[in-house]
Amino acid sequence: MARKAMIEKWKKEPKYKTRAYTRCRLCGRPHSVLKKFGICRICFRELAYKGEIPGCRKASW
């Protein structure tokens, strides 16, 4: 779980736009965030298994 101080800092508008970075909306994780969904890979996987992300299927080839 991300530190609460870092999550609060992330929510504020940065002084310069280049300082902005992605962070998971659910858990606050700063790494491996899928921009299309706005959540990290771990949260994405959990939601996909539950069927809460429409149109998402497990790959099989």
From Swiss-Prot:
Query: How is its cofactor bound, per UniProt?
Result: Binds 1 zinc ion per subunit.
Q: Keyword set for this entry?
A: Metal-binding, Ribonucleoprotein, Ribosomal protein, RNA-binding, rRNA-binding, Zinc
Q: Can you list the GO cellular component terms from the UniProt entry?
A: cytoplasm; small ribosomal subunit
* Domain of life, source organism: Bacteria
Q: Name one GO molecular function term.
A: rRNA binding
The record describes its quaternary structure and partners as: Part of the 30S ribosomal subunit. Contacts proteins S3 and S10.
HAMAP family linked to this entry:
Ribosomal_uS14_2_B
Q: What is the protein's name according to its record?
A: Small ribosomal subunit protein uS14
What gene is this protein a product of?
Answer: rpsZ
